[in-house]
Amino acid sequence: MHKIWHDRGWDDYLSWQGSGDCRTVRRINSLLQSIERNGYDCIGNPEPLRGNLSGWWSVRINDKDRIVFRLADGRLEIMSCKGHYD
């Protein structure tokens, strides 16, 4: 599956890598791998989003951070991986 990072998602990911928080980076990588393998049946308590984010899903990184993503045409699009649907 091909990953497409939106600008914010990539900036979030680089921010996590630069933070020195290896545990969170490993968790993000594990979640992305699970999404690639299992789609919306992945780990991380996947939830469909509503409103202006309809069509997007989220999975929990930790108590306050989520990966916001969608699957389309064999692609994994990552909108963000920090914060909570901002």
Residue ranges and their predicted role:
Residues 1-65, 71-86:
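Basic, Lys/Arg-enriched alpha-helical interface segments
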